Amino acid sequence: MGPDPAWPPVLVAEDLLGAGVVAAFTGRVGGSSAPPFATLNLGLAVGDDLRRVLANRRRVATVLGLAGHPWALARQVHGATILRVGTGRPGAGRPAAGRPQADTVGREVGTAAARGPWVEAGGLGQGPPEGKAPLGEADGLVSSEAGVVLAVLTADCAPVLLADPEAGVIGAVHAGWRGLAAGVVEGGVAAMAALGADPAAVVGLVGPAVGGCCYEVGADVREAVGDRYPAALATTRDGRPALDPAAGAVQALERAGVGQVRVAGECTVDLAGRHFSHRRDHGRTGRQAGLIALVPSGTGGGR
């Protein structure tokens, strides 16, 4: 199956982050995967053909002008752990400040080295050696090194991309209801601050996620998130209790002092032609991504 030309493979956030940052949210169209992963599936752990997934990733990287740069992905567990990511190369990017520090939810900000073009946590799919290098379990990544692509994979949860362009610090957060309730978004901002970012100078981008129109939840889930983020409380079209993860992420960013927040405003369940949705497709589906990288000014071909 050849690449699907019907839609651009990425939604690029333009003119928000300056020339030194590339950020994008991918959709489901523009790749080479077959149903039920058609077509731009970027997840290795869903049962898709490995060669097609890697081809899809390479296509996205090429469009963004990031071909050959290492991708950093953690094993996402719907928690609040944040990892600091670097290439391990002496002198790469801006120097990192200090030792690992505690984030706002009391977990240590770990350190991991990204080796190879597709860095995955251990156990995420079967692939070549570069597909097995572990970053560990985490739902947020931060970095101050140029050339490292931070990536979070989603299929209903909210992908949150963060950047302080002046300080040269970026972050990517996977925010589902459990992560929201645990404070993963604020943890990502705090981890960036530990690397020298100013929350007031941070730009936050919240990508496509399941909307309150379609995300019916039980009373326990609604309470766990709604008690912390009332903005996340919603009602489905037929009047049932629901949550809006993107709205919760926005409120979390605002509480963390993030200076500018933009929201994609697209529901992954509603827009079946544009996005993968675990809920809509009963778990048999692909993964889209939120991607962000620091790059030298003037690079980043997709901008």
Label for each model-derived stretch:
Residues 1-303:
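Active-site microenvironment for binding and transforming phosphate-containing groups
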